[in-house]
Amino acid sequence: DIVYLTGIQQSHTGIEFEVSAQLNQMIRLDAGVSMGNWVYTDDATGTYRDGTEDKTYSYALKDLKVGDMPQAGLNLGLTATPIEGARVQALYRFYALHHSDWDPTSREFSDGENPDRNASWRSPSYGILDLNVSYDIPFEYSGVTSQVFLNIINALDAVYVQDATDNSRYNAHPWRVGNHTANAAEVYLGLPTSFNLGLRFNF
């Protein structure tokens, strides 16, 4: 059984802004912000073919938000170079307006029915702080230099929803109440605090 959907169209618009400033000899500030508006622009139709006849279905998509990606973000980075060869950076990342992933075929409706035009569940906004430290070892051998580094990802151990599926048929809350709610969503949490320590050689 195959359903052929036609007329699915999305509009992706938005703005991005980035700025950098060397505050003094040791401190550099980097910032960036983005805001998007990603929506389905019209309803769609689908044709079901079972080998003997075709049946047409309608799908209520117009003005619904595209899911599975945050539509707003903010980045702030502060980098310090206290001594020659040393670099310490704090990077804060903030994400918002993240609608959960959803299937357009779930919005099927027939003539005379009241279609479901409610947006998919929007997961909570969240922010993550990363810390990065590196030091260029002041030693060179035959053109080979080295650097030691430490990266701490999600340094504050924030708990956040990284991805979600709207109205999950598999992992929604067993006492789910209402469509397009947190109880009806399947969520994937982001990773807790992690770090990596390494030595890099440059040839």
What are these regions (language model features)?
Residues G67-Y141, A164-D166:
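C-terminal beta-barrel architecture of Gram-negative outer-membrane proteins
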Residues N24, R28-D30, W121-V133, I152-N154, ...:
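Conserved long hydrophobic alpha-helices within structured protein cores
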Residues I2-P104:
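Gram-negative outer-membrane beta-barrel transporters
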Residues Y4, K62-L64, N118-S120, A182-E186:
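Short, P/G- and charge-enriched loop/turn segments at secondary-structure junctions
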Residues T13-F17, A72-L76, G127-V133, V148, ...:
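Hydrophobic, lipid-facing positions within transmembrane beta-strands of outer-membrane proteins
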Residues D1-Y4, D50-S58, F109-P115, S168-A182:
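Surface-exposed loop/turn segments flanking beta-strands in extracellular/periplasmic regions
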Residues Y95-S106, D136-F203:
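C-terminal beta-signal and adjacent terminal beta-strands/loops
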